[in-house]
């Protein structure tokens, strides 16, 4: 009972400290304003008129001062970055014919890897502990025995995912293809010629002066890189919009070998994609869902271990796949630390920044063994969208950032329902929060993504308006069942 009382007292002490630091300027100004008000009340009308009459300004001085104020204001507003709005987005929902229950996945594995039962057993153990559910999907070409990862099959998957997501976005926003000013496509492992962005331009007959970009090889954090590219372009092109397509094409990247480190992606990655509409038009302010506040990118490619921890390569038999290093979680943790060191001062309240600075100075000057202070990011954000790369990734970030189960619920449920959809997973998570009716006006969202190279990228969004629970979308047919309990091990 005494421990409980102490914890309650400590909680209120911390709340009082936070209130004092975060409202320091307000508390400081209150006595000043009160003093001025009291002095004015003590003065009579004649004294006030006498003070006003003593303030003589020449007309020239007034005009010069006015001109200076107007000039400074004009320069300020012209140099101020344009606000970037997230008008709306759409997540691809695969058809039920692409569903891959555990039983089907393991049956395919036994038939494809019939000469190597140990690899089959390894995949089964991974799947049991993966956090994936029975409704994740793989493209049609992977359902064949053996799989048929041809160029045509890969293009068919790309068209199915991208065009469906774009059609939904057009329907939800009323945007016409001819009105698109900027197009950015990110797909890490499938980079055909002509590019995927050219495929979209051809399909929708987009304008000849459209600014199109196709990003490949950027990994699971590529969606936020695309947002960064779009933000920079929207700063120099006024009254414009940008469409971002984030996806990963699974068809050509199914690994057929026996290397365990390269079999992991087969168990985790599933098909998916998202189409996102950004705009810098002031007229879109009232209908936009979010506005972009901050975007921070961290790249640790100069370090050899970080560079090599996620690598596309051939095994000894010539089978191409993605090799995931055992050091992946350690490297991801280091990248996250570097990223939050940059984004922390931009978003954390003064109370948390002061505690973090005190801890840092204490470790540098007094004792390096002092436990570092982990800022409470729950004071800066109401919602967290952590890349659903796997159960271990979500567990590690929940532990490091001291988040509750509800804070990482969107990530866990997205992994369960859709699997690791690579760069688009952040948008499935945001869609989950909206589908649960939790997104309110002025709520802040932190998107965190990791990618090969090794990269950690963060984006901070602020909700423009309370989001009504959508009646359609990727979660529309299953949101009533979520959240679900996900056991540590699912016996197959």
Swiss-Prot record:
Recount the UniProt induction comment for this entry: Repressed by herbicides such as flufenacet and benfuresate. Down-regulated by darkness, low temperature, salt, drought and osmotic stress.
Q: SUPFAM superfamilies per the record? A: Thiolase-like
Amino-acid biosynthesis listed as a keyword: no
Transmembrane regions: 20-40, 59-79
The source's domain of life comes to Eukaryota
Q: Which residues form the FAE domain?
A: 76-365
User: What role does it play?
Assistant: Mediates mostly the synthesis of VLCFAs from 26 to 30 carbons in length (e.g. C20:1, C26, C28, C30).
Name of this protein: 3-ketoacyl-CoA synthase 5
